[in-house]
């Protein structure tokens, strides 16, 4: 495909037009009085949202240079959302302000690399200040306030705080769409995975189609079990102990399955066969998690353990195992706390080193099942609002977790506006000092935009907030200047610093760009004759 190339001012201005088109659509949603944006879908009803990253994803521009500019800002929103779950609109507003001020200085003759260094030094100083100023989140009320602001609904904040209180900060909180209106919270005790019994004959409660084993042994096998002679020696030992047995394996089939079912029906021996969750390496890892949770071992040829020689010492134990046709829950495994803590640390390290969003999500689920528990928030709303509400709750959950992780600062853009005094641009020289001043100007952008959306004069509000004591700012919902932390208006530090760092990173890229190579727009082909006739033929 042919390419089109733009240089110098033309290249940067093209990128800036794309950035502005996207930022102008996103920034109207900032703050408690932010507006909504309607997104047209190819199929189905339009989506109504005030979520920055959702709006950014939908914007596709025609001009090739503008398109690249918009894509770069989408990356800012996406990275901030990935790291912190919120702050996408703040990041976009900051990026727009940094680029606007930066390009003005480049046009006036400043060296882009000097500006870049100044921006980086100023951002580093602000980040350090925010982390030092952060207040730890210790109470349920603080979590509720943080999540409530993110979701734009105090009731959602309270429900998320309740869920976090129950499952702990490592626990998984998932959000599902519900057919009924309102919000519901479901809590799962123990480790749950989405595989059930292999045969309905294992059910101990025929009406509920559920098998409940009290104080069972847990046998974990990485392969298939098909012959009864491999299983028999271990079965005899378990029967002598008088305990039921839960078998979790890749599959249980043939005569081994028939033997278990016949013994269950006759009442000789209570057991249940369950398919192991996942595939390949993920299945092996999950079986190992279960082994550590229950204090057992995974029987696998890879480590030299075979089923026919295994004794009771390789079996795990739990207070209860509940199995339905779709899922299994292991309650109160007998594994040692030290081993579980070691496994949790290992999974946490894997999460930090993973580049894949999908892998990170799956590792996070495994971590929660070992360390905390699982809470499900079921959200119901009118059809056109349902997806948007679910997305808002998911963002609020991640926001609350970010607050617990690094603490909170005053919200409403005030912590950024008041951070302009923490670095001394006079200590820098030339273009580096100019770069630091660009950051100082841009730090006011979020509070100014919140003021605009609330129908207030942005310059006056920014000036007043900047000169107020630390933590004091504008409550845009009421129009009152007050102690924002005391009023429950706060932002997680992780969200605020991620927004600034990602915005500065993309702004530096804009300023140091000297050429843009883009695909040349294709000319539309000649229209096809709808009658199917031959072109150019006249009859």
Swiss-Prot record:
Compartments where located: Cytoplasm
BP terms from Gene Ontology: protein refolding
Record keywords, A-Z: ATP-binding, Chaperone, Cytoplasm, Isomerase, Nucleotide-binding
Signal peptide segment: none
Similarity annotation: Belongs to the chaperonin (HSP60) family.
Protein name: Chaperonin GroEL
InterPro entries: Chaperonin_Cpn60_CS, Cpn60/GroEL, Cpn60/GroEL/TCP-1, GroEL-like_apical_dom_sf, GROEL-like_equatorial_sf, TCP-1-like_intermed_sf
Subunit structure: Forms a cylinder of 14 subunits composed of two heptameric rings stacked back-to-back. Interacts with the co-chaperonin GroES.
UniProt binding sites for ATP: 29-32, 86-90, 412, 475-477, 491
Protein's UniProt keywords contain Mitochondrion: no
Keyword Cytoplasm: yes
Function, as annotated: Together with its co-chaperonin GroES, plays an essential role in assisting protein folding. The GroEL-GroES system forms a nano-cage that allows encapsulation of the non-native substrate proteins and provides a physical environment optimized to promote and accelerate protein folding.
Cystine connections: none
Domain of life: Bacteria
Catalytic activity reported: ATP + H2O + a folded polypeptide = ADP + phosphate + an unfolded polypeptide
Record-level Gene Ontology MF annotations: ATP binding; ATP-dependent protein folding chaperone; isomerase activity; unfolded protein binding
SUPFAM superfamilies listed in its UniProt record: GroEL apical domain-like (SSF52029), GroEL equatorial domain-like (SSF48592), GroEL-intermediate domain like (SSF54849)
GO CC terms: cytoplasm
E.C. number: 5.6.1.7
């Amino acid at each position: 495909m042919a390419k089109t190339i733009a240089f110098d001012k033309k290249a940067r201005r093209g990128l800036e037009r794309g950035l502005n088109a996207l930022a102008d659509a996103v920034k109207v949603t900032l703050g408690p009085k932010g507006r909504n944006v309607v997104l047209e879908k190819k199929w189905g009803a339009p989506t109504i949202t005030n979520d920055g990253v959702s709006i950014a994803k939908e914007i596709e521009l025609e001009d090739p240079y503008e398109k690249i500019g918009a894509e770069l800002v989408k990356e800012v929103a996406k990275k901030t959302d990935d790291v912190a779950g919120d702050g996408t609109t703040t990041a976009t507003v900051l990026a727009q302000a940094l680029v606007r001020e930066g390009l003005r200085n480049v046009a006036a003759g400043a060296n882009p690399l000097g500006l870049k260094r100044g921006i980086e030094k100023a951002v580093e100083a602000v980040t350090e200040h925010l982390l030092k100023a952060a207040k730890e989140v210790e109470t349920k009320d603080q979590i509720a306030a943080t999540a409530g602001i993110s979701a734009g609904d105090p009731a959602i904040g309270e429900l998320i705080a309740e869920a976090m209180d129950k499952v702990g900060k490592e626990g998984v909180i998932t959000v599902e769409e519900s057919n009924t209106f309102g919000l519901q919270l479901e809590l799962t005790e123990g480790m749950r995975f989405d595989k059930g019994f292999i045969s309905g004959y294992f059910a101990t409660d025929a009406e509920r189609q559920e098998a409940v084993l009290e104080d069972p042994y847990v046998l974990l096998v990485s392969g298939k079990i098909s012959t009864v002679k491999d299983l028999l020696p271990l079965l005899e030992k378990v029967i002598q102990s008088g305990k039921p047995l839960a078998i979790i394996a890749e599959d249980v089939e043939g005569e081994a399955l028939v033997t278990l079912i016949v013994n269950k029906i006759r009442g000789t021996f209570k057991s249940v066969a369950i398919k192991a969750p996942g595939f390949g390496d993920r299945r092996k890892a999950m079986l190992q998690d279960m082994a550590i949770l229950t204090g057992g071992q995974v029987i696998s040829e890879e480590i030299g353990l075979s089923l026919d020689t295994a004794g009771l010492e390789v079996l795990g134990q739990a207070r209860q195992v509940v199995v339905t046709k779709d899922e299994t829950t292991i309650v109160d495994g007998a594994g040692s706390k030290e081993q579980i803590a070691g496994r949790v640390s290992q999974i946490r390290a894997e999460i930090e080193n993973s580049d894949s969003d999908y892998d990170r999500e799956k590792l996070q689920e495994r971590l929660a099942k070992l360390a905390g528990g699982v809470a499900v928030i079921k959200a119901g709303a009118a059809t056109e609002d349902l997806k948007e509400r679910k997305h808002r709750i998911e963002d609020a959950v991640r926001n609350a977790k970010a607050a617990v992780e690094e603490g909170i600062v005053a919200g409403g853009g005030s912590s950024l506006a008041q951070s302009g005094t923490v670095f001394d641009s006079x200590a820098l020289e030339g273009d580096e000092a100019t770069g630091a001043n660009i950051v100082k100007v841009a730090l006011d952008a979020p509070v100014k935009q919140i003021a605009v959306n609330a129908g207030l004069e942005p310059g006056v509000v920014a000036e007043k907030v900047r000169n107020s004591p630390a933590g004091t700012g504008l409550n845009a919902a009421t129009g009152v200047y007050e102690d924002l932390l005391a009023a429950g208006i706060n932002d997680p530090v992780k969200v605020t610093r991620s927004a600034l760092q990602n915005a500065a990173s993309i702004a530096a890229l804009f300023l140091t760009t000297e050429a843009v190579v883009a695909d040349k727009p294709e000319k539309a082909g000649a229209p096809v004759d709808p009658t199917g006739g031959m072109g150019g033929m006249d009859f």
